[in-house]
Regions:
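Non-globular, low-confidence helical/coil segments that flank catalytic cores
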Residues: 2-162
Length: 162
């Protein structure tokens, strides 16, 4: 039989935890315009776009796992989901960080330009295999493609169609 003070402690703890969770949900800052975060990944590129509707788009992920610590500074810890990963071109310093991110984050889809990696290696093959195994759609896009979400429109200007 649980004594009265232990029951009171458990109930009080649950109420505090509930208030904390709802505080995280309702007190987070409201984004009224898109935010762009240029992530420090060392050699390479990575850019996070946060849309007002909470959509997260990550373009490139650098050459290694450094992207994880940069991303953790720009995204809420309780949101391990990225709506769209974009690989601008298949060079290691742009795509390989996704190999690390896929162990920590879930992705809704990936956009690629459809061109082959200049020297495809095990890392590129591993990335494509992991994406496929997880059932994440890979969408091939090129010049002239337009992505629309709510009031946000992104136009693809490269690579030029062959």
């Amino acid at each position: 039989m649980i004594n009265k003070s232990l029951g009171t402690f458990i109930l009080g703890s649950l109420i505090i935890l509930d208030a904390f969770v709802w505080g995280l949900i309702f007190l987070q800052p409201k984004t009224i315009s898109p935010e762009i975060h240029f992530l420090d990944v060392g050699q390479g590129d990575s850019t996070l776009l946060l849309l007002p509707s909470k959509v997260k788009i990550l373009t490139d992920a650098g050459p290694d796992g450094k992207v994880i610590s940069s991303l953790e500074k720009s995204m809420p810890f309780y949101s391990p989901y990225i709506d769209l990963g974009i690989i601008s071109h298949p060079q290691r310093d742009h795509y390989n960080g996704f190999n690390y991110l896929l162990n920590h984050y879930r992705f809704g889809a990936f956009l690629v330009n459809g061109r082959d990696a200049p020297a495809p290696g095990a890392e590129w093959a591993s990335l494509l295999e992991t994406i496929e195994k997880r059932g994440i759609p890979i969408i091939v896009i090129g010049e002239g493609a337009r992505l629309r979400y709510d009031d946000t429109v992104m136009s693809i200007v490269s690579p030029i169609k062959e």
